[in-house]
Amino acid sequence: MNTDVAPVKSKTERKPKPKWLRVKLPTGKKYTELRNLVDKYDLHTICTSGSCPNMGECWSEGTATFMILGNVCTRSCGFCGVKTGRPETVDWDEPEKVARSIKLMQIKHAVVTSVDRDDLKDMGSIVWAETVKAIRRMNPETTLETLIPDFQGNERNIDRIIEVAPEVVSHNMETVKRLTREVRIQAKYDRSLAVLKYLKDNGIRRTKSGIMLGLGEQEEEVIQTLKDLREAGVDVVTIGQYLQPSKKHLPVKQFITPDQFQKYEKIGLELGFRHVESSALVRSSYKAQKHLN
């Protein structure tokens, strides 16, 4: 059993964040330039809308994350701050808009993600493919990571991603098997593993996944999830601290200590991952450009 955590005593208690979760405000010339561009042209990035703690660091390295297919999700995951409900009509101009944003911001490495669109027959996979194509046309030097939904495991939809060949394809497990139904009620642990394995088996050179800690998982469950990901051929894993977006979301059960994150990094590397990003403030796209190597 994992005891290297700082417990939160009750479901309703919201304790102050430990010192290792406090971050400095982003600064620097490159960050300021990009911040001004985003504000001037009303560019939409997850970095800003999600108030990512790593925004300044990533932008300074020329990396940013964009969300497509609207901002309303058909799923209601207990950890996620994205709105849920009836999504907007598909904007077929969105691929060009995202590509232009990347060009304006002079992004070297772009991460693209999306809400789940279970309301669409193709689950959004056509817009996904068109977005990658548009980015390639307008930004031929920019490398790409696509952080995709599970597309309900539909291989034809996953094939559309494979056909446009992003440098990295990521799909997040989010949590351990025991907690999957509670944390990702419309998702399935084994289906997510199958998606990752299918990507690797069908030509994606670099696959990636991420998990959050602090939802009540035990150390042995985290290690088993890492083993499952390696068995599926995953190359890169990110491990970070879950933070409750609002009182309506799942509570934080534990604040994981820096020493425990370092332990998981060591275990992950021993299991054979090419890269393991493991610390409290790590998010899916943290140090994303490094994962090309």
Swiss-Prot record:
Q: Which cofactor does it need?
A: [4Fe-4S] cluster
Please share the entry's free-text remark on the cofactor: Binds 2 [4Fe-4S] clusters per subunit. One cluster is coordinated with 3 cysteines and an exchangeable S-adenosyl-L-methionine.
Q: Which residues bind [4Fe-4S] cluster 2?
A: 73, 77, 80
**Binding positions for [4Fe-4S] cluster 1 per the UniProt entry:** 47, 52, 58, 285
Q: Which reaction does it catalyse?
A: [[Fe-S] cluster scaffold protein carrying a second [4Fe-4S](2+) cluster] + N(6)-octanoyl-L-lysyl-[protein] + 2 oxidized [2Fe-2S]-[ferredoxin] + 2 S-adenosyl-L-methionine + 4 H(+) = [[Fe-S] cluster scaffold protein] + N(6)-[(R)-dihydrolipoyl]-L-lysyl-[protein] + 4 Fe(3+) + 2 hydrogen sulfide + 2 5'-deoxyadenosine + 2 L-methionine + 2 reduced [2Fe-2S]-[ferredoxin]
Where does the record say this protein resides? Cytoplasm
**A GO-annotated cellular component:** cytoplasm
**TM spans, by residue?**
none
Q: Name one Pfam family in it.
A: Radical_SAM
Protein name listed in UniProt: Lipoyl synthase
Q: Which organism is it from?
A: Christiangramia forsetii (strain DSM 17595 / CGMCC 1.15422 / KT0803)
Q: Which taxonomic lineage does the organism of this UniProt entry have?
A: Bacteria, Pseudomonadati, Bacteroidota, Flavobacteriia, Flavobacteriales
